């Protein structure tokens, strides 16, 4: 089961990055110098394909993002022993997607980017983008789990347009986009700051929305509970798109990772 989850993460992240970079390359050829046209097209293509990928692979695993994986581990939705394999699959998949996009448009498989992405404004944009992404996943998975694919894909499409950084919001995306010298690239020296601010945004979102929804649950419970009943309702799990399926044997996962029988 773990192997299939990792393959799903690899495939989904690869297709996501092929979409981002491929659409960027194509649209930049026809935008006549108007970069806004390219960004709008990337947002539309990314939102559409991300929705399809979550629907396609959600029954297995559809994090496609190390920050989402780390947040799930911190919430104890997945074992920490799974985190490294998940992140490795996501990063390798993202790199494969970028390479495929380069090749589709007759470029070199790998061409290191020189596109500068730095400064307070862009880092703030990345913090906001990642904070919002985790918030959308966290809140929608509790209020309307079936709407997570729509909510996440719409948010990402919108965040590409409204943030100064064009919403990387994903360390695997950031690392892989070093490998394309196109409009979608990022200079290697700018990558550490992007990843650091993404992790900060994700962790801040986890703390904030955990407080927000726990406080809401406590208020609701206090209004309806019998005197002396102080137990809070259990936190709802996120839908299968962002956590392991409910019937997954976590001990089987550990055996697969360690090679034990």
List where the protein language model places each region.
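Membrane-interface helix-loop junctions and terminal tails of multi-pass membrane proteins
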Residues: 1-261
């Amino acid at each position: 089961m773990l192997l299939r989850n990792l393959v799903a993460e690899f495939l989904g992240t690869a297709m996501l990055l092929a979409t981002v970079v491929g659409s960027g390359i194509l649209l930049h050829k026809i935008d006549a110098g108007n970069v806004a046209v390219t960004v709008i097209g990337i947002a539309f293509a990314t939102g559409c394909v991300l929705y399809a990928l979550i629907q396609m692979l959600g029954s297995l695993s559809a994090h496609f993002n190390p920050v989402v994986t780390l947040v799930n581990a911190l919430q104890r939705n997945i074992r920490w022993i799974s985190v490294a394999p998940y992140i490795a699959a996501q990063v390798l998949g993202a790199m494969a997607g970028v390479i495929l996009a380069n090749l589709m448009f007759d470029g070199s498989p790998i061409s290191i980017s020189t596109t500068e992405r730095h400064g307070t404004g862009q880092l703030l944009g990345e913090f906001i983008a990642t904070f919002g992404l985790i918030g959308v996943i966290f809140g929608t998975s509790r209020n309307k789990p079936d709407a997570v694919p729509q909510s996440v894909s719409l948010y990402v499409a919108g965040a590409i347009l409204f943030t100064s950084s064009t919403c990387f919001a994903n360390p695997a995306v950031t690392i892989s986009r070093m490998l394309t010298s196109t409009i979608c690239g990022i200079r290697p020296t700018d990558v550490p700051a992007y990843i650091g601010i993404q992790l900060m945004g994700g962790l801040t979102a986890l703390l904030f929305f955990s407080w927000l929804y726990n406080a809401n649950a406590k208020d609701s419970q206090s209004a309806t509970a019998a005197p002396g009943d102080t137990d809070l309702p259990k936190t709802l799990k996120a839908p299968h798109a962002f956590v392991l399926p409910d019937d997954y044997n976590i001990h089987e996962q550990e055996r697969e990772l360690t090679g034990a029988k």
